[in-house]
Amino acid sequence: MNSLKTLLVGFGSVGSVFFSATVQAQVPGAQTTSEIGLGAGGLVYKGELAPYYQFRNNRPAITAFYRRDLSGAVTARAALMGGMLRADDRNVRGLNGNLPPLSAYRDAHLKGNLLELSGGIEYNFFDFHDRLDKVHFTPYVFIGVAGFYANTEVESNAFPALDKKGSTLSLAVPVAVGFKYALSRHWNLGLEVGARKTFTDNLDHIDGKSRGQTDRIGNPNDQDWYLYNGLSVSYTFYKIHCPDKSDDKGKKK
């Protein structure tokens, strides 16, 4: 219940940002810039079965997003992303390059799917939409709030009691860095790498102890993460708000 309340408050805050942008855009003579886009890349799980980023754990993911510029530097963004999750204890390597004892002992693997709805703010270092400027690219940073639904299954070759399939609905804090390039007045390319800090340890259903066992088979104090890296294409819309002519007529009278 608390997670749901936090999620609603978070999205309410993001929604207020979009509302403020709409109000500001009504200033006569102001130019509103917005984008819609699609992206594709890889989704990576990080948790008990993959304690660090592993390139081989990348699984297909797609995203659709909407951006609205609040200023030349600040952009509000909402996005929907879906992808697959995979991990295997046998792919983990320790400092000596060998399979860590815990991973070998547990011998588990995970698979599943994840759907995320997010909103947040991008900070652009350059105004790459300004066609009068020679700079048509910008690096940016992003931070926001996300709600996600994950349906995953974990199986262990050593502990049948670990086998579990289930779903999780929770919150995450997405942070990312990226790069945008304006191909033309309307078309843009993007590259982004980001991480999502979740508030659950249930993506892999391993909470620190095996079911029916007293052995430690995970870290009960380490919550799960997931990461996204990908490319995107977006289309920019421009709108210039002209002064209301009715106001001028009223003044002449």
Q: Where is each model-derived feature located?
A:
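Gram-negative (and chloroplast) outer-membrane scaffold detector with strong preference
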Residues: 72-155, 237
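Transmembrane beta-barrel architecture of outer-membrane proteins
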Residues: 57-61, 114-118, 138-140, 170-174, ...
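Short loop/turn motifs that connect adjacent beta-strands in outer-membrane beta-barrel proteins
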Residues: 25-33, 72-73, 127-137, 185-186, ...
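Predominantly the C-terminal beta-signal and adjacent terminal strand-loop region
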Residues: 184-253
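Residues on the lipid-exposed face of transmembrane beta-strands in outer-membrane beta-barrel proteins
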Residues: 38-40, 64-68, 119-123, 143-147, ...
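Short glycine/proline- and aromatic-enriched beta-strand/turn motifs that initiate or cap beta-hairpins
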Residues: 24-68, 152, 228-241, 253
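Extracellular/periplasm-exposed beta-strand and loop segments of Gram-negative cell-envelope proteins
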Residues: 48-55, 85-116, 150-170, 202-209, ...
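Bacterial Sec-dependent N-terminal signal peptides
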Residues: 1-31
